[in-house]
Amino acid sequence: MHVIVLGSGVIGTTTAYYLARQGAQVTVLERRAGPADETSYGNAGQVSPGYSTPWAAPGIPLKALKWMFQKHAPLAIRADGSFYQWRWLAAMLANCSAGRYSVNKERMLRLAEYSRDCLRTLRADTGIQYEQRTQGTLQLFRTAAQMEAARRDIAVLEECGVPYELLDRNRLPTAEPALARALDKLAGGLRLPNDETGDCRRFTLQLADKAKALGVQFRFNQQVEGLDVRGGQVAGVRVGGEQLAADRYVAAFGSYTRGFLRPLGLDLPVYPVKGYSLTIPMTDESAAPVSTILDETYKVAVTRFDQRIRVGGMAELAGFDLRLKEARRKTLELVVNDLFPGSGAVEQAEFWTGLRPMTPDSTPIIGATKYGNLFLNTGHGTLGWTMACGSGQLVADQVCGRQPAIRADDLALSRYGAGGQAGGGVARAQHNAA
């Protein structure tokens, strides 16, 4: 069986790897010069099932209003000129009830925990190295109110059997010794010992090499011009003036998947949420984190790689705008200087931005479509690295006709009632970016 995977970020590359492991002939099409060159390039570095929390949550609408007037707000909404942006926001607001929050968080935790297990198995099987650390994650609270609000998430963690430690201020240095210098700014934290960290781009580059060793063909610098659809099936991919045909197809174009598949009558509720990061050369190991923290106030993560510190986070809903904004850099610098002063050469940092493909319920879209041989793997939002291996394994199982190890039906596009019925004729979609 021949499968074409569209996209070679961490999602597309893990999908290709797991398909090849199951004996499929795999071709990956990517417009960039190599894997992990866009959204997977500079993310926060956290593999954090325990923090798999929906953005759509009770209280978020009120918080969003307050954030509009804050200089270092974690969320910013800027009109992109489209009606779709407001339709997507309305759908997100509809998921902010306590009931929807619980349903969505359970789905996210289920996939994220499974994905972490898949990552560990893959690491044991391949020996892949990506500056990984398995020392847990620590969510930091600056106020007592944040500590109290965390108890709602703790209830879900307990229900799902996820280990945790709730730490008061004085116990924070037991997890992150460098925080001893910043205790006066903190109220406490929530530690998740089973979470991990690692450089997503390095992982993806190495996994691509291992996929090639299994026979996967990567075709880079390829502009996908469209899909041909006939009789309820994808008949081929138009790329570089030629048509490539396969038995199955997987769309993993991240934020661009919606626009790519829209001409086919598939309505994917995916919106690009812009995030930022700094990658800082470490100068003082004793002042740096040993693993990773998430600052609940600013929604910014600070993660330790071998000799680098990655500071990432924030969310802008502003369409496909990839301009770097100095104000966002200042927020990232504020957090790392506040919590880990003197840990790195901030002035030498690489400043980066990328677009995360977010759904209104924060749960990815994984699985079949109304076209019998077209599958989706997109919409992971801020958790693409966390959910990558599990998502790749799930899609590979579905494509190859195997029973997935976890429930996956509620991850499919059909949960939105989107897409209608497959039709005949030819549909073509332009791929403007991958």
From Swiss-Prot:
It is an enzyme of class 1 (oxidoreductase). It comes from Bordetella bronchiseptica (strain ATCC BAA-588 / NCTC 13252 / RB50) (Alcaligenes bronchisepticus). GO terms for cellular component: cytoplasm; plasma membrane. GO terms for biological process: D-alanine catabolic process. Pfam families: DAO. Oxidative deamination of D-amino acids. FAD binds at residues 3-17. HAMAP family: DadA. The keyword Nucleus does not apply. Belongs to the DadA oxidoreductase family. Keywords: FAD, Flavoprotein, Oxidoreductase. It catalyses: a D-alpha-amino acid + A + H2O = a 2-oxocarboxylate + AH2 + NH4(+). This is D-amino acid dehydrogenase. Its cofactor is FAD. One of its GO terms (molecular function) is D-amino-acid dehydrogenase activity. Its EC number is 1.4.99.-.
